[in-house]
Amino acid sequence: MTAMLRSSAEEIFADELAALAKGDDRERPANWKMSPQAVVTYVLGGRAPDGTVIQPKYVGNRRLIETAVATLATDRALLLLGVPGTAKSWVSEHLAAAISGSSRRLIQCTAGTDENQIRYGWNYAQLLAKGPSREALVLSLIHI
């Protein structure tokens, strides 16, 4: 049996996400569920076009969220950097939920995470048996 500590952002705030997406008639980047403006409203709070109250998920500098969303709307990556406890994981989960509809494929790192750990891992039984080979390589989520 698998137990979840808590439901995902897209499950907890499904009504808010649906209300924002339904009333969102602005241009959306390719593969986005809603416009950048609606994503900012989802994260910072406000009202959906139908009057649904959108709870703030982040209380802080509005420009930080606007810049993060604008960066994601381009072809650039976004790296949230800061001391522990500053809501980086929380914000990234909500951005993923609003943009793609799923926050299940987040990649979380620490200061000690190597770039290669993000890209792939090794099946050590195969590595010992056959040496470094494609069969021993285990691709990470970014390749799925």
Task: Write out the residue ranges for each language-model feature.
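AAA+ P-loop NTPase catalytic core and its hallmark functional loops
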Residues: 2-142
